Structure formats: structure tokens, C-alpha cells
């Protein structure tokens, strides 16, 4: 777990630094600082609420899709789409797993941390920039 959090923090740091071009000009970049505590909360909440269907490694199961699909890139499914799917459920539309029911019992800070965790894993695996 510590290795994953360290890797995610390092990935986020590298992504923040990627805005510097060779011309010496800095390209404006929005960077959010993610604490180790938030990543831990996200990982723990993901395991508790999401991993049965989406896999311990975000690669999916026979019950739900992988988050390493172009469907889940930020420009296709924004963070808000993840949050709404958890809160309201989601009708089957990309996969043949059936409808996703709303997930009960997730606190707002846990939900935000889950999305941050999933995006961090996607970045660490080279799935998103």
C-alpha cells in the first residue's frame, strides 16, 4: 500500500512538472495536491465498495468493467460521471454487466477519494497522462 501511495504521489509530481517546456516558458497546468491520507482513504474505500465488481487492481471482474478502458478516460467519463454513477446508479450502456445499482454507505469524502485513487492508478499504469 505504501509503495502504491508513493508511486501515485510521484506520478502526480511528474505530471505537474510536465508542464515545463524546453523553451523555458511554463505552460499553465492545473495541479491538485493529493495527500497520502487521501490516497489511503481512496484505496481503502475502493476495496470496500468497488473492488468486488471492478477488481482489486481496477481491471474489472465478471461482474463489472475495468477502469482501464478508453470509456473511463477523463475526457469521456469525467470525475463527476463516476460520482453520479455511484450515487444514482447507472443503466447498462457500454458493457453487458447489467445496470449498476447505486452504492449505499459511501461518505462524500470517501467518494472523492475513490475517484482520486482510480485516476491515480490509471496514471501510474500509463493509461492517462
Q: Where do the protein language model's features map onto the residues?
A:
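Bacterial N-terminal signal peptides that target proteins for export
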Residues: 1-9
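Short functional linear motifs
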Residues: 6, 39, 108-111
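C-terminal motif of bacterial Sec signal peptides marking the signal peptidase cleavage site
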Residues: 16-19
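Electrostatic cytochrome c docking/interface patches
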Residues: 21-45, 129
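Gly/Gly-Pro-rich "capping" loops immediately C-terminal to redox-active cysteine motifs
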Residues: 33-39, 56-87, 102
